[in-house]
Amino acid sequence: MLRHGLFKDRRVFDENYIPPELRVRRGEAEALARIYLNRLLSGAGLSDVNMIYGSIGRVGIGKTTLAKFTVKRVSEAAAKEGLTVKQAYVNAFNAPNLYTILSLIVRQTGYPIQVRGAPALDILKALVDNLYVENHYLLVILDEFQSMLSSPRIAAEDLYTLLRVHEEIPSRDGVNRIGFLLVASDVRALSYMREKIPQVESQIGFKLHLPAYKSRELYTILEQRAELGLRDTVWEPRHLELISDVYGEDKGGDGSARRAIVALKMACEMAEAMGRDSLSEDLVRKAVSENEAASIQTHELEALSIHELIILRLIAEATLGGMEWINAGLLRQRYEDASLTMYNVKPRGYTQYHIYLKHLTSLGLVDAKPSGRGMRGRTTLFRLAPHLPADRLIEVVDNIIQAKMASGYE
């Protein structure tokens, strides 16, 4: 009979949980924190803009965790020196304009700043003034930063004013008080910055690329979560090794700590549901299998443009309709029709259309192959990646498209 359950702290398995220490990428966190602290403790204030980015198509590789951990460490180290560094976190995907971004930042500072109905520039000025009056500093994480660069509702001038606020709205005492840590999906964000705000891109101090996790790194992460969140008698090293070998990038996995942690959590929940008081290898394998089957990377899909999502949906629709492969010409025709009739957006030209297809293929969402004999002319055939459930994917894509269109994204 199961009396106490397998978990001693379920929060450890939440997606937003930040561990008390980073056993993997501790050096990267220390290097980032040192950049902010060196300037701050020398009396130069905060004005740094640094960036963390991943690899194309890789999610769950610790970018947000590293950013939040670093900012927390900066705040704690500054407090020991008698300085107050406030922290703010904004997911830019959910904040489509400068007003919303500033409103979220102000809310986290706790300053009595009136934001409703106020112009964004006035809010920013009030924030700078409050930091001066209180002699505080502010370190802001802008997650999903590439969303800000692609948003039609955030002008280049707005981005420049925000990230170079000490130039546009200097503090009354001349001390820079706002720093930024940008978190982007991959290196393409730097290219977008060069196009939209080259003056800021050239001044990014530290650009940190995070690769996907290897199996030994995933084991270390899982071990920490198990120690903090599970009862001691619940798990054995072999259970963690099994999961880390499945997801480790060096073992053919996608290197996602997020998926590895979810698999461990699922295995424990299965054991609890069966009345067991510990894990078994068969349950771990079952959890991994179910986690793989249900694996739709919502985070990854949210980073796609509306046009990429429309194309992906059409390919999934073809799969659901029993079409193993769809040729590029027919897909193009369906894309044009769907763009105009279903989504009321102008379809992109052929060059951009093929760029979208290449991107979807590079992410592993779509398979592509040249047509064989028996087809008139040479073309390319596409299908949904076999590991993705078409019906569930369509449901997720529809929700994302609806949210993007409501926010003015293309």
UniProtKB/Swiss-Prot annotation:
Q: Which UniProt keywords apply?
A: ATP-binding, DNA replication, DNA-binding, Nucleotide-binding
Judging by the UniProt lineage, the source's domain of life is Archaea
Binding residue positions for ATP:
G60, I61, G62, K63, T64, T65, Y213, R225
Function text: Involved in regulation of DNA replication. Binds DNA.
Could you say which protein family the record assigns here?
Belongs to the CDC6/cdc18 family.
The domain comment in this protein's record states:
Contains an N-terminal AAA+ ATPase domain and a C-terminal winged-helix (WH) domain.
Name it: ORC1-type DNA replication protein 2
Q: Which organism is it from?
A: Aeropyrum pernix (strain ATCC 700893 / DSM 11879 / JCM 9820 / NBRC 100138 / K1)
